[in-house]
Curated annotation (Swiss-Prot):
Pfam families: Beta-prop_IFT122_2nd, WD40
SUPFAM superfamilies linked to this entry: WD40 repeat-like
Predominant cellular place of this UniProt entry's protein: other
Spans of repeat LRR: 1231-1256, 1414-1436
Organism taxonomic ancestry: Eukaryota, Metamonada, Diplomonadida, Hexamitidae, Giardiinae
Disulfide bonds, paired cysteine numbers: none
GO cellular component, one term: ciliary pocket collar
Subcellular location: Cell projection, Cilium, Flagellum; Cytoplasm, Cytoskeleton, Flagellum axoneme; Cytoplasm, Cytoskeleton, Flagellum basal body
One GO term (biological process): intraciliary retrograde transport
Listed name of the protein: Intraflagellar transport protein 122
Keyword Repeat applies: yes
Organism: Giardia intestinalis (strain ATCC 50803 / WB clone C6) (Giardia lamblia)
Highest taxon, organism lineage: Eukaryota
Length: 1709
C-alpha cells in the first residue's frame, strides 16, 4: 500500500483537536483555538466561524449532517446548523473533551469532569439528563445499535453506560485512553484454523500471549462507588442478553502504547487489566487478589507510539498520535501490518502549508494497468518514501542522528490529535501546529492467474481464489500481511513478510485436468460467472483449499511463480528455484540484462518451465533442472507481457511501445535433442517468419552462462497490432487472441479482428478469455479502498459472440475449395480444411445461430468431410439431412460426391444450382422438388458465405455438365457461370458481394423455341401478360407490376432441367408439378402461362379466377377464339359472334373445343358475380349461348337488344314478357306489368304477382291500394273459377286473402303509432316512445289504442278467419264477380245481418273504426319468451302500453309490466317514473302514495345530508333534457327525480316497502382519488360517528364544523349544487376516517358503466352510501338493488320468505 500526501491546509496556530465530516463527505469541520473551520474535499476553506468558547476542544456532527455541536474549556455545548447558525445550548461545570451522537441520531452524549449529559435530539421539550461521573472523560464511542455507549477517561477507566444513565460495566486500562471505537464482531477477520508457529525474531507479525487474570483497580472501585446506584445485577444481565452485547467489541488504544480488544459482555466490576500481558511478574504474591475473567480481553498488542486518535476502515485500524506516525493494524488481533507515514515538522507539506500540488498529483498517480507477471524492484515503496522524506527533513533541520521511525519519538514536536477517513481512500490528519494534512492511500493489487483459476488479495490479510468459468470461490483468511501470491493447477502459494504458505485444492476433477473448460460451466449453471448478488450462488459448492505447509523463511522477490513441487522467486537480476522445503535447487543470474516479465508455461511435474522476457527484447524459457535457458526469439523492444496459445503454436509479445507481435512457437521438427555439439542447420529457403531455436549454444547473457545467444538477428513476427496494452490467448479456442487497447478489446483470429467491444472503464484489460466469455479486469477500483475488495467489482464478464469466428473459418474453408482445381477433378479433403472445420465446430459449440451451423455442414459436405458433416448435423438435430446423407452414401454410384454437393447446396437455399446438379445426376424427381424453392428474380441469398458457395456450385456444374450440353444449353451454362461471381469477403465485414444481373442475351433463343411450339394464342397471351395492359380493371387488377414470362428465372431453369428428362412423360410431369406449385404459391400469372404452355386453357382460367386476376383474365379471353358450333337453323349473325381473323379455330367435336367451352363458362360466371356485365356479354357472345346472352341483357337493362334477340329467337318471347313485367313492377307501373303477364300466357303467375304487389303496398303503408289489389286478386280467383274447376291453388288464394286482411289491420295500428311519433315527438324511432309525457293521459290515448291493436292481433286468429268466411263462401259458390271494395262491403253487411250483436262482441273483430276496450288486455297471454308478439314489433312498446292501460285497474298486470320494463333497463327519464310506480304497486298495495303526502310522514321528513324538509312522497313533474341526464347517472335505489334535494342536490334513498326516507348519503371519491384507493380506505379505520351527531340526532352542518378534521361533515361536499343529483365528494383521508360499519359499498349493475367510468371496477359501477345514524337498521337486497328499513324487511321476509320486490329467497338477515 502506497501513501502520499495530497494537500495541506494551514487553519491556525493552535492544535487541531477535533475533525468531523458530513456523511456524504462534501463538508468537513476542524476545531482550532476558538474557531471552527469549514472546508471541502477540494480542498477549499468555505467558512471560518468564531465561537464563544475560549478553546474548542471537541466537535460532533449528527448522522444526517444537519447539526454541528462544538464544545470547549468553558463547559458550554453549542448546537449549530450546517450554515453556522446557533440553535440552542446547555452547559457543564467543567471543560468538555468528549461528545458523540448516537448512530441513529436520536441521542447526544457529552462528558465533562464530574457529570455526563444525555440529550434526546428528537424531543425538543426534553431537558438534558445529567448523570454524575468521576474522572476526566477523554473519548466516547456508541454501539452501532445506539443501545449503549463507552466512556474512556484520563485515569484509564472504561465505563459502559445505557442512554438512561445506568452503568453496565467498567474496567481500568492503567493509562489514559484517547482513542476508542465500538464495532461488531462480524467485521473481524476469521483466523485460520491451522495453528502457525511464528518466529518472533524474523517476523513483524508477532503474536502475544494473553493471560486471563486481572488485578482490581483502586481508582476504578473508587469511581464506581461515587456514582448513582441501581439494581445492577438483575438489570445488567437482562440488558446484556436482550441487546446481544457479546456480538460487539471495544477497540481502545491507551498511552501505555497498547492496543486492546475488549468483550463488553464480560463483567469486570472496575478491574484493572493493565498487566494482563506481564507474564513474567510475580503472580504468587498477588494471587489472593486476582479473579478469573475469561473472555474479557480478546486481544492485545503493542504499538510504537502514544496513540491519540483512531479511525477504522473495514477490518483495519489506523492509529496516530505523539510523534506524527501513522500505522495500520489488524482490528481483530492488533498486529502492525504496515507503517504508513511519518509526519516531519520540516516536511514541505507542513512547513509550506497550505500546499495543493497540481502537477505532482498526476505524476504520482499509480499506474492503472496492473498486469500479472511484471518484475519490478522489491524494496517496499512506503519505506523508501519514508526514508527519502526523513533525509530531506533532517537535512533541513541539520540533524544527523535519527532514530527508527517505528520507535517512540519523544523529540518530535508534531502530534496528531485527530483523524478522519474520506471516501474513497484518503485520510485527513489534524496536527498540533494547526495544519491539516491529507494522505492518499494507494492499494497495490496482488493477484495471480492460471487458466480459469484466479487468486487475488482481499484487503491486506485475505486471499480469494475463484474459478472464472464456474464461479466457484474460496476465501482464505491468512491473518498476516500478504505480500505476494501465485497459483498453478491445484497449488496455491502465499508469501508474507516472514514465511511462505502453501495450500492444495481438494478437487479430484481439477487434478485430472489443468484447466476447467467453459463447457463445465454450461453443464452446471445458466447465469454466468459474475453475479453481484452472492445469494444466487449459495447452492454452488465453493473451492476447497487445505493448508499443506509453511516455509518459515523470509523470501525477497518481485514475482512469485509456483509449480507442483517447486516455486520460482523472480527478481530483476536473477531467478531462483526452491522446493517446498525451502531448499534452492536452481538459480539463474543476469548481469547485463534485466528481467521484465515472467510467466509459467507448465510442463512435466518437477520439470516445469517459465517464459521470461527481458528489457533487450529477448524471450527465453527457463526449465527446472536445466541450467541452460532456451532462447525463443529476439524482439526489437523491451518486453512488457508474454503469452502462449494453448496448442503451443504461437506466442504473443507486448512491448513498451504498445505493440503486440505474434510469433510462431517451437516446432517439434526444429528441436534437436541428444548431441550437445549439434549445430542447427538452416536451409536457404527457410522462412524468416519462423522462430529458430539456439539449443546448447555456448554464449550466455553476460558472457559466462551458456544457453542464450547474443546475436542481433531480430525475429520476424507473423503479424502485429499497434496500440495494445495487453494480449492473451483463448483457453478453449487455439488461435484466438484477445487484444486489449486503452478503450476496447479486439478478438483476433490470424491477422484479422472478428469482434470488438468497448471497455466500461478506460485502461482495463482482458484477464482471461475462455471461449465465448471474456473476463475484464476493471482498474477503476485499484488503489481506492482498503475494505475487502469483491471480485464482482474487479472482474467484469463480457459475452463474446462466436458467430464471427465461425463465419471466418467457414469462409476460409470455402475459399480453399474455390481455389482448388475443379476442372481436374481434385480430391477436396485436406488437412488444412479439416483443421479449420474442427476449430469452427469448437467455436460453434459455445453458441451460434442455426445459420452458422448449416454453413459449417455445407462446408464439410463440399470438402467431403462426411464425419464432420454428420457431427454438425447431429448437433443441430437435422435428421432429414442425416438420412439423405445415409441414402446417398449407401448407393454405389460414381456421382456420390455430386449428390452430396447438391444436398449441401439445397441446405443453404442454393436451390437452382442444386436442382441442376440433381438433374445432371439423373435425379429428376429431386430436381423438380428443389425447383419449388426458387424465386423468379434469382435474388442473391442473404448469407456471408453465399457468394463463395455460389461460385463453388457453378464450378461443379461446369465440370459435370460441360461434356453433355450443347447449343443453347451451353449458353445457359455460361450465364450461370457469370451470375453472382464471388469475391473474397474480408474478416470482420458483414457485406456480401452482390450477384451480377442475369444476362438477357439468351431470351431470344427461348422465345424462338417457344414460338416453334406452334400455338399463336399462347404467344399472344404471353406477350399480353408481359406487357401488362393498364386498361384492364376489376377487383383483382394485376397491373401494379409487370410480369415477363420469358425472363422468369424459374421457367428458364425448368426448361434446362426438362432437357435432362429421358421420356416425354417425365417432361410432362415436371411441367405439371411446377405449374401446380406456382399456383399454390400464389404465382398466378406464372402458373397460368405454364398451363397455356402445355395447351390447357381451362386450368389457366381456373388459376386466374381463383386469384381474381381480372386484368390478366380479360386479356386471355379476348385472345381465345370463339367456341365452334353447328347451327341447326339460320339465325341472323352479329358482329360480336365473328371470330378474329388471326384466331385459330377448333373443330366442334375436338377436345380443345370442349376445354375452351368450359373455360368460357367459368370466366362468364366470374364476371357475372363481379357485376361486370359488359365483359360477361362479350364472353357469352364468344360462347354462343342465346339464353345466357338474354339473361345478361335483361340484367344489364338493354331492352332494345332484348327485343332484337326475341325477334331472332321467337321461342324466347314468353320469357322476355315475364322479365319485362318484373321490370315494370319495380318501376311501379302495375297495369303495364299485368298486361305483359297476359302476353306471356303464364296465367298461373298472375295471382302471385298480384300478391307481391299487395305486399309492396303494405310495406309502403298504402292501405287503399292494398284493398284495391285485394279485390283484383278476388276477381282473378273468380275468373279462374268461372272457366275451370276449382283447383288446389285456389284454396291457397283464399288463405292469402285472409292473411292480407289481417296484416292490413296490424299495420293500420302500427301506422297510428308512427303517426303519433312523428306528430308529437318528431321522431320515427320507436325507442323514443319512452319520451312520452305519461302524466297527461289524454295525449297518450292514441298510443294505448295502437298498442292494443298490436297486442291483440296474435290472439285473434280465429276471429279473423270467421270474418272472411262469408267472402270465401261467395267465391266458392261463384255467385258473382265482385271488386275488392264490394267484396269487403258485402262481407261486412252479411256479417252484420247474419250474426247477432252478442256474437259480434264475442268475436271482437277489429276494423279501422273499432275502438278497443282496456278490459280485453287482462286476458292476453304473451308468455315469457314473447312467442305471440308479431315479428318486427318492439317488446318495449307492448309493455309500456300494458303498464299505462292497466294502471289502478289491474294491479297484477301493471306489476308484471313494470317488472319487465325495469328488467329491460330502459334509458332516459322514464326509468325514474317506472321505479316509482314499481314501489307504489309492490311496496304499499293497501295505500295510495300517488301524489299526496303520506299520513306516515313522521318517519323521516328531512334530507339526511342538509336536514332540508322533504315531503314523504313528492308529486311527479314533467321531465326535461337536463333531468334525463341527471336521472341516467342516479343509482338504481334512488327512485325518482322528484326525490333529489333542492337544497344540497343529494338524491334521497327510500325504503322499497314503506317509501320512508332512509338516513343514507350518496358519496363519491374526488378527482385525485381513484376508485381502488377509495375502496381500500373505506374499509380500513373505524370512527365513532355518534359522537359527531347533534341533539336532533342529525348531522350538524355548522360553519365551525366545516373547518375541523373531525366528523362526517368533513366528508360531505362543501359546495353542493342544488338539483345536480351527485353525492358528497370525499378525499381518500376522509374515506379512511369513516367507520366501515357505516359505509355501504353497492354494485350498481343497473346503470350504464360508460356514464361513470371513474367509478367502474370490473365493468360494474361502485356506489358508496354513508349511514348518518349508526344505530339505524338497514338492509340492501343485491337481487333488486333496493334499500329497505331493516325492521320492515325482516317482518316481510319472515312471513313470505322472499324479497318483496324481486322475490329472492337466498336472504341472510
Amino acid at each position: 500500500m502506497k501513501v502520499e500526501p495530497l494537500w495541506s491546509l494551514d487553519v491556525g496556530t493552535q492544535p487541531v483537536y477535533s475533525l468531523v465530516r458530513t456523511p456524504d463527505g462534501t463538508k468537513m469541520y476542524a476545531a482550532t483555538g476558538k474557531t471552527v473551520v469549514t472546508f471541502g474535499p477540494g480542498p477549499e476553506i468555505t467558512r471560518q466561524t468564531s465561537t464563544q468558547h475560549p478553546l474548542v476542544t471537541c466537535l460532533a456532527i449528527s448522522p444526517d449532517g444537519h447539526m454541528v455541536v462544538s464544545m470547549g474549556t468553558d463547559g458550554a455545548v453549542m448546537f449549530n446548523d450546517s450554515t453556522g447558525a446557533a440553535l440552542f445550548k446547555y452547559s457543564h461545570q467543567n471543560e468538555v473533551q468528549a461528545a458523540a451522537f448516537s448512530p441513529d441520531g436520536s441521542l447526544f452524549v457529552s462528558a465533562a469532569i464530574g457529570d455526563v449529559g444525555i440529550y434526546h435530539c428528537r424531543d425538543v421539550k426534553t431537558k438534558v439528563m445529567k448523570q454524575s461521573f468521576k474522572g476526566t472523560p477523554r473519548a466516547i464511542a456508541w454501539a452501532p445499535g445506539s443501545d449503549w455507549f463507552v466512556i474512556s477517561t484520563q485515569d484509564g477507566d472504561l465505563v459502559i453506560m445505557t442512554p438512561e444513565g445506568m452503568e453496565l460495566n467498567s474496567c481500568n486500562l492503567g493509562a489514559p485512553a484517547w482513542a476508542l471505537k465500538v464495532v461488531q464482531c462480524s467485521s473481524f477477520l476469521v483466523q485460520p484454523n491451522t495453528a502457525l508457529d511464528v518466529d518472533i525474531a524474523n517476523s513483524s507479525d508477532d503474536e502475544f500471549t494473553i493471560p486471563q487474570t486481572v488485578t482490581p483497580s483502586a481508582s476504578a472501585s473508587g469511581r464506581s462507588g461515587s456514582g448513582k446506584r441501581h439494581k445492577v445485577e438483575l438489570d445488567r444481565e437482562e440488558f446484556i442478553t436482550s441487546h446481544n452485547m457479546d456480538n460487539f467489541r471495544i477497540l481502545v488504544a491507551s498511552w501505555d502504547m497498547r492496543y486492546r480488544v475488549i468483550n463488553p459482555s464480560v463483567y469486570a466490576d472496575g478491574a484493572c487489566i493493565a498487566k494482563m500481558t506481564d507474564g513474567g511478574s510475580d503472580s504468587r504474591s498477588r494471587s489472593s487478589s486476582r479473579r478469573r475473567l475469561d473472555g474479557l480481553l480478546v486481544a492485545v498488542s503493542e504499538i510504537p507510539f502514544i496513540p491519540l486518535c483512531m479511525e477504522i476502515i473495514g477490518n483495519y485500524v489506523f492509529l496516530s498520535g505523539v510523534g506524527g506516525s501513522v500505522v495500520v493494524l489488524n482490528s481483530s488481533n492488533g498486529r502492525v501490518l504496515s507503517s504508513l507515514y511519518q509526519v516531519w515538522e520540516s516536511d514541505p507539506f507542513i512547513s509550506k502549508a497550505p500546499l495543493i500540488p497540481t502537477e505532482s498529483q498526476s505524476k504520482h498517480l499509480p499506474q492503472k494497468r496492473t498486469i500479472m507477471g511484471q518484475v519490478t524492484t522489491c524494496t517496499d515503496v512506503n519505506q523508501r518514501l519514508m526514508e527519502l522524506r526523513k533525509r530531506e527533513a533532517m537535512a533541513n533541520r541539520n540533524v544527523k542522528n535519527v532514530t527508527n521511525p517505528l520507535a517512540f519519538h519523544g523529540m518530535h514536536t508534531i502530534w496528531c490529535y485527530s483523524m478522519i477517513h474520506v471516501e474513497p481512500s484518503s485520510l485527513i490528519l489534524g496536527l498540533s501546529n494547526g495544519v491539516l494534512l491529507c494522505l492518499s492511500l494507494r492499494y497495490a493489487m496482488i493477484h495471480s492467474q492460471y487458466g480459469s483459476l484466479y487468486a487475488y488479495r482481499r484487503g491486506l490479510m485475505s486471499v480469494s481464489v475463484m474459478n472464472l468459468s464456474t464461479g466457484r470461490e474460496s476465501i482464505l483468511e491468512v491473518g498476516m500481511h500478504v505480500e505476494n501470491l501465485s497459483i498453478y493447477e491445484s497449488t496455491l502459494a502465499i508469501k508474507t513478510s516472514s514465511r511462505l504458505l502453501l495450500y492444495r485444492l481438494q478437487d479430484p476433477a481439477l487434478k485430472k485436468r489443468n484447466i476447467e473448460s467453459v463447457m463445465d460451466y454450461y453443464s452446471s449453471s445458466t447465469n454466468g460467472l459474475i453475479e453481484t448478488d452472492r445469494s444466487r450462488r449459495q447452492n454452488m459448492s465453493s473451492l476447497s483449499y487445505s493448508f499443506e505447509t509453511s516455509i518459515k523463511k523470509r523470501f525477497v522477490c518481485s514475482q512469485l511463480i509456483v509449480s507442483n513441487n517447486h516455486f520460482f522467486l523472480c527478481n530483476v537480476s536473477h531467478i531462483s528455484v526452491h522446493d517446498f522445503s525451502g531448499k534452492q535447487t536452481d538459480r539463474w543470474t543476469f548481469k547485463q540484462l534485466k528481467c521484465t516479465y515472467v510467466r509459467s508455461i507448465g510442463g512435466i511435474p518437477s520439470n516445469e518451465a517459465v517464459l521470461v522476457g527481458f528489457d533487450t527484447g529477448k524471450v527465453c524459457i527457463f526449465k527446472i533442472g536445466n541450467k541452460f535457458p532456451i532462447e525463443l526469439l529476439l524482439h526489437r523492444s523491451p518486453i512488457v507481457s508474454l503469452d502462449i496459445s494453448p496448442d503451443r503454436k504461437y506466442i504473443s509479445v507486448v512491448d513498451r511501445s504498445d505493440v503486440v507481435s505474434v510469433y510462431k512457437f517451437l516446432d517439434d521438427s526444429e528441436i534437436v535433442l541428444g548431441a550437445t555439439n549439434m549445430a542447427v542447420v538452416e536451409h536457404e529457403n527457410t522462412p524468416t517468419s519462423y522462430s529458430r531455436i539456439a539449443a546448447l549454444a555456448h554464449v550466455s547473457l553476460d558472457g559466462n552462462l551458456p544457453g542464450i545467444t547474443t546475436g542481433q538477428d531480430y525475429s520476424v513476427p507473423l503479424y502485429t497490432f499497434k496500440g495494445t496494452t495487453s494480449a492473451i490467448w483463448d483457453l478453449v479456442l487455439p488461435g484466438v487472441l484477445a487484444r486489449s487497447t486503452q478503450k476496447s478489446v479486439d478478438i483476433c483470429i490470424d491477422s484479422g479482428v472478428s469482434y470488438t467491444f468497448q471497455l466500461s472503464y478506460p485502461g482495463s484489460f482482458v484477464l482471461c478469455q475462455n471461449g465465448n466469455r471474456a473476463f475484464i479486469f476493471n482498474v477503476s477500483y485499484l488503489g481506492q479502498s482498503l475494505v475487502n475488495l469483491d471480485y464482482s467489482s474487479l472482474i467484469e464478464m463480457v459475452e463474446v459472440p462466436m458467430m464471427p469466428m465461425v463465419i471466418y473459418r467457414t469462409h476460409k474453408v470455402l475459399r480453399m475449395l474455390l481455389d482448388s482445381n475443379y476442372e481436374a477433378g481434385a480430391v477436396f479433403p485436406s488437412q488444412a480444411a479439416n483443421y479449420e472445420l474442427n476449430e469452427a465446430i469448437k467455436a460453434a459449440n459455445l453458441g451460434v445461430p442455426m445459420d452458422c451451423w448449416r454453413d459449417l455442414a455445407i462446408a464439410a459436405l463440399l470438402s467431403n468431410e462426411l464425419d464432420l458433416a454428420r457431427e454438425v448435423l447431429a448437433t443441430i438435430g437435422d435428421i432429414r439431412s442425416l438420412k439423405a446423407i445415409a441414402e446417398i452414401t449407401r448407393q454405389t454410384s460414381t456421382k456420390t460426391y455430386l449428390l452430396l454437393s447438391a444436398l449441401a447446396l439445397s441446405m443453404c437455399d442454393h436451390f437452382s444450382e442444386a436442382s441442376l446438379l440433381f438433374a445432371a445426376s439423373d435425379d429428376i424427381q429431386m430436381a423438380t422438388e428443389l425447383l419449388f424453392f426458387i424465386n423468379r428474380e434469382c435474388i442473391p441469398y442473404n448469407s456471408p458465405n453465399s457468394s463463395l458457395i455460389s461460385s463453388i456450385a457453378k464450378k461443379l456444374i461446369c465440370r459435370e455438365l460441360h461434356s453433355s450440353l450443347t447449343g443453347t444449353e451451353e449458353k445457359i451454362l455460361e450465364v450461370l457461370k457469370t451470375q453472382g461471381d464471388s469475391t473474397y469477403s474480408p474478416l470482420g465485414t458483414q457485406t456480401a458481394p452482390e450477384a451480377k444481373e442475369t444476362n438477357t442475351a439468351l431470351l431470344t433463343d427461348f422465345s424462338d423455341k417457344l414460338l416453334a411450339k406452334g400455338r399463336a394464342t399462347v404467344n399472344k397471351f404471353l406477350s399480353a401478360i408481359e406487357s401488362g395492359s393498364s386498361k384492364a380493371d376489376g377487383p383483382g387488377n394485376d397491373n401494379k407490376d409487370t410480369y415477363n414470362y420469358f425472363n422468369d428465372y424459374r421457367i428458364l431453369l425448368r426448361r434446362q432441367i426438362s432437357s435432362f428428362a429421358k421420356t416425354e412423360s417425365e417432361r410432362a410431369n415436371l411441367v405439371v408439378r411446377h405449374s401446380k406449385f406456382l399456383e399454390t404459391s400464389l404465382e398466378w400469372r406464372a402458373a397460368a402461362a405454364s398451363y397455356l404452355d402445355m395447351d390447357d386453357p381451362e386450368s389457366a382460367i381456373d388459376v386466374l379466377i381463383t386469384s381474381k386476376q381480372t386484368g390478366a383474365l380479360l386479356r386471355l379471353v379476348r385472345i381465345f377464339p370463339p367456341v365452334a358450333r353447328e347451327l341447326n337453323h339460320k339465325a341472323p349473325s352479329f358482329n360480336d359472334f365473328e371470330s378474329p381473323e388471326d384466331a385459330d379455330e377448333y373443330a366442334p367435336s375436338s377436345v380443345q373445343n370442349q376445354m375452351l367451352k368450359r373455360a368460357y363458362r367459368k370466366a362468364l360466371v366470374y364476371f357475372e358475380k363481379s357485376n361486370d356485365y359488359s365483359n360477361a356479354i362479350f364472353i357469352a357472345q364468344r360462347l354462343g349461348d342465346p339464353l345466357v346472352l338474354l339473361r345478361l341483357l335483361i340484367q344489364q337493362g338493354s331492352w332494345s337488344q332484348v327485343e332484337a334477340l326475341g325477334k331472332a329467337y321467337p321461342e324466347m318471347m314468353p320469357s322476355i314478357h315475364e322479365a319485362k313485367a318484373s321490370m315494370l313492377l319495380r318501376e311501379g307501373r302495375f297495369i303495364e306489368a299485368l298486361e305483359r303477364l297476359r302476353l306471356s300466357g303464364n296465367t298461373s303467375k298472375e295471382a302471385i304477382i298480384i300478391k307481391q304487389l299487395i305486399d309492396a303496398s303494405i310495406a309502403e303503408c298504402k292501405f287503399n291500394l292494398t284493398r284495391a289489389l285485394t279485390g283484383q286478386l278476388a276477381k282473378q280467383i273468380a275468373k279462374t273459377r268461372a272457366f275451370a274447376a276449382l283447383s288446389v291453388s285456389s284454396m291457397e288464394y283464399y288463405a292469402a286473402i285472409k292473411a292480407i286482411r289481417a296484416r292490413v289491420l296490424v299495420y293500420t295500428g302500427y301506422q297510428q303509432v308512427m303517426e303519433y311519433m312523428v306528430n308529437i315527438l318528431r321522431s320515427r324511432d320507436l325507442s323514443d316512445i319512452t319520451m312520452i309525457r305519461l302524466h297527461d293521459n289524454t295525449q297518450s290515448a292514441k298510443v294505448v289504442t295502437a298498442g292494443i291493436f298490436l297486442t291483440s292481433y296474435a290472439a285473434m286468429a280465429n276471429e279473423l278467419t270467421n270474418a272472411d268466411s262469408v267472402f270465401s263462401e261467395e267465391l266458392e259458390n261463384n255467385t258473382g264477380i265482385l271488386s275488392g271494395e264490394d267484396t269487403v262491403k258485402a262481407s261486412s253487411q252479411r256479417s252484420k245481418k247474419d250474426n247477432p250483436p252478442s256474437l259480434r262482441s264475442t268475436i271482437g273483430f277489429i276494423t279501422s273504426s273499432t275502438t278497443p276496450q282496456l278490459g280485453s288486455l287482462a286476458h292476453i297471454d304473451l308468455g315469457i319468451n314473447n312467442m305471440n308478439i308479431p315479428p318486427g314489433i318492439s317488446e318495449l312498446i307492448i309493455w309500456v302500453c300494458l303498464a299505462l292501460a292497466s294502471r289502478r285497474t289491474y294491479p297484477e298486470v301493471e306489476a308484471r309490466a313494470l317488472k319487465r320494463i325495469l328488467a329491460s333497463r330502459i334509458p332516459g327519464p322514464m326509468i325514474g317514473y317506472f321505479r316509482r310506480q314499481m314501489l307504489l304497486v309492490k311496496g304499499t298495495p293497501a295505500k295510495d302514495f300517488s301524489h299526496g303526502e303520506s299520513s306516515d310522514a313522521e318517519s323521516r321528513d328531512a334530507c339526511p345530508r342538509c336536514a332540508a324538509p322533504l315531503k314523504a312522497l313528492p308529486p311527479s313533474r314533467p321531465v326535461g333534457a337536463q333531468d334525463m341526464a341527471i336521472l341516467s347517472s342516479l343509482p338504481h335505489c334512488c327512485p325518482v327525480f322528484s326525490d333529489i334535494c333542492k337544497n344540497c342536490g343529494s338524491p334521497i334513498v327510500r325504503s322499497a316497502l314503506s317509501l320512508k326516507i332512509l338516513p343514507l348519503v350518496l358519496a363519491e371519491p374526488d378527482d385525485e382519488t381513484s376508485i381502488a384507493v377509495a375502496l381500500e380506505r373505506a374499509a380500513a379505520v373505524e370512527m365513532d360517528i355518534e359522537a359527531l351527531m347533534g341533539e336532533t340526532n342529525r348531522l350538524e352542518i355548522g360553519t365551525d364544523d366545516l373547518q375541523t378534521d373531525e366528523g362526517v361533515v368533513d366528508v360531505l361536499r362543501r359546495a353542493s349544487i342544488a338539483g345536480d343529483g351527485r353525492g358528497a365528494v370525499l378525499t381518500s383521508e376522509q374515506f379512511e376516517k369513516i367507520s366501515p360499519a357505516n359505509i355501504f359499498i353497492v354494485d350498481d349493475t343497473w346503470s350504464n358503466p360508460s356514464l361513470l367510468p371513474r367509478f367502474v371496477v370490473g365493468n360494474v359501477i361502485k356506489r358508496f352510501f354513508i349511514r348518518t345514524i349508526s344505530d339505524f337498521q338497514l338492509h340492501y337486497c343485491t337481487g333488486c338493488g333496493f334499500f329497505f328499513d331493516g325492521i320492515e324487511y325482516e317482518e316481510y321476509v319472515i312471513v313470505t320468505g322472499s324479497c318483496p320486490i324481486c322475490g329472492a329467497t337466498n336472504i341472510v338477515l
